Amino acid sequence: LEFYTNVARYGNSILYRGYKNGHRFEDRVRFGPTLYQKDINGTATALDGERVSPILFDKMSQVKEREQQYGGIGAKEMYGNKNYVVQFLQEKFPDNIEFDRDVINVTSIDIETASDDGFPEPQLAEKEVTAICMKNNIDGIYYVWSCIEWSKQETILKHLNVVYEHCKDENELLVKFIGHWSSPIYCPDVVTGWNTRFFDIPYLVNRIAKLFGEDVAKRMSPWGLINERRITTMGREQQAYEITGIAQLDYLELFKKFGYSYGPQESYKLDHIAHVVLNERKLSYDEYTDLHSLYKNDPQKFIDYNIKDVELIDRLEDKMGLITLALTMAYRGGVNYSDTLGTTAIWDAILYRDLANRGVIVPPNGEKFKADYPGGYVKPPQVGMHEWVTSFDLNSLYPNIIVQWNMSPETVVEGERCSMNPDIALAEEHRNSHSEYALAANGVYFKKEKQGVLPKIIVDYYNERSIVKKKMLASQQEKENTDKSNEVEIIRIERDISRYENQQMAIKILLNSLYGALGNKYFRYFDLRVAEGITLTGQTVIRWAEKSVNQFMNKVCETKETDYVIAIDTDSVYVNFGDLVKKYVKPGTEVATIDKICEEQFLPMLEKSYARLYEMFDCYTPRMVMAREAIADRGIWTAKKRYILNVHNNEGVQYAEPKLKIMGIEAIKSSTPSACRDALKALFKVIVNGDEEQVQKAIATFKKYFSTLSPEQVSFPRGVNDITKWARKREGIYAKGTPIHVRGALLYNHHIKALGLQKKHELIQ
């Protein structure tokens, strides 16, 4: 088994690092790329239908020389993939890339620095490094270097295997660290931690360069290559370093990208996220005023604090598996691990690999014209409380629209367009007059003679995910049937389950991110007609469901023109079953009866309705499937995307006690104080299950409790960015019109400086 862990271009060479039969290797490969040019006699065909012929380059630099020779015109007309790393990987691994997660060295790191003058700036790296802790998944040992005393016998982390090296000074500490990091045994393939990309790694690189010179700092790269990057996030420019040969997968970034099942957070500090995910905290040092006091007065606890941070990262990965997920996605796309944190790069590689294996050449890449186009349809809700609400959801709306209408850049019919929009479609005033094409709701036609590249990949991914999920379920059943005392077999099965889970989750995430890539004007396959076609067709499809639902409900309930659809949100409809329940359902049987009506009448009606839509647009293949989601005895809407449902049954799962589904309400917003969120959730249960008197009593009780809480417990969690935009050095501290939370941050910084407290408290940036 051979696979890569990092591939980079250096001049005319490809620096290739990976594993072969369980052993790490590093190789420097001379690589000559292949690109293509238009040629009416060419033997190859590009995705856009052009005939092309290959241009074989001896080295990568020749491509740029050719572009300069033709003054940039040649670059625009050159077909093929100019991402040479991806091209190299496609040639090296044209098929599915298998990998062994267990041999890949994933190293977690955390550093501590002197903070007697306040929080240190990584770009300046003026303060000494006081402790470094590293732990890899290969030997499971926590390696720690520091100049203070620490005893293994006195640690509170006795369950961990710690190797502590006491150093005489910072120089020795950093020399030992570099020796460990750069050794063939311990050099990482992946380095992770919490905010390591913008703090730990740049601080180490800058500090080592300051003390020993840049050549020593470059030893952090197995190739001796480190490149500085300037990255602007939230209006603030930050320094990062690309360590050639080693992937940086900052767990903070991974959590923000893939940890969406936990929802938005009031804070993204490690202490808070560890509490949310693991119900654990960082090691508390509340008995000391700050980290510097802890370092000076309790060295034992200071090192324990350092080790604990690394352990928390390790435990987050054990539970969430986000690094394994990123690796799985990277090998699926044939890209470097860090490319999974974006959207367009991985999809560009996925499509390139698929087309290359079919002998189709990718078109040139370049910025396209992009005008504004409509998004998903959100219906203004019927505000207030509703009895017996049932929700229905279209399965993967946008990917399935792409498949049903065969939408892809190469299937767009050039020069053909009709006056079509969602309103015309819903009135059924216009039928597709070109049966050889599929008509989208923006009036664009798509060819049907063969499946487009985007629909093909979506279908392939869906089919593969279905197979993987079946394997995962089979393994879960195998685990249930296996003797629990057979630990070796249980571990094997759990590893299989984890692998399948990551595979299916990687496919799901990629499918969900495809539309985002298609709407990006820098994406090779961006086409405004396709992007607009997807969203306007999506609006039509969900409003078509609304029309069909209202026709059905008015007929069954013997009403006229009553709107039974309370709300619509892109791919979901929320239907008021209150009249139907009053008219036909026996008390006490509501949930079971609604479930039966949905299964036997509602869903078949929607299936027939979507078959009519399919015929009207002359689609490529039917893919619209609506499923029943929640049955709730009460629902409350306050505005678009803001509601509460008291759910009794969800997707066929019957709850012993109803569960609240809350969307957009302050009770789940990370900007609402935690104490208020908990109180609101409790209050909602009273609202849906009690009466006015009970609600007023609950509010009065909390109001009394609220007045006893500290300012920290009731203040609004708010993030700020680009605060320098509002700052004023003269004529006051902040500009007129400064938002209140930014004003607070500027006032805080002003008083910290005025009182000389920078050493104790970090400024808000």
Give the ranges of each region predicted by the language model.
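DnaQ-like (DEDDh/DEDDy) 3′-5′ exonuclease domain used for proofreading
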Residues: 1-187, 308, 312-331, 338-375, ...
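Conserved catalytic palm subdomain of right-hand nucleotidyl-transferase polymerases, strongest
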Residues: 109, 249-250, 384-397, 465-468
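Active-site-proximal helix-loop-helix substrate-binding element of RNase H-like nuclease domains
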Residues: 142-145, 152-155, 161-164, 168, ...
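Proline-aspartate-enriched helix->loop->beta-strand connector
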Residues: 177-203
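Common nucleic-acid-contacting/processivity interface regions adjacent to the catalytic cores
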Residues: 289-409, 415-416, 487-553, 567, ...
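Non-transmembrane amphipathic alpha-helical segments
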Residues: 458-479, 507
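Catalytic palm subdomain of template-directed nucleic-acid polymerases
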Residues: 573-602
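C-terminal, non-catalytic extensions of nucleic-acid polymerases
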Residues: 599, 603-765
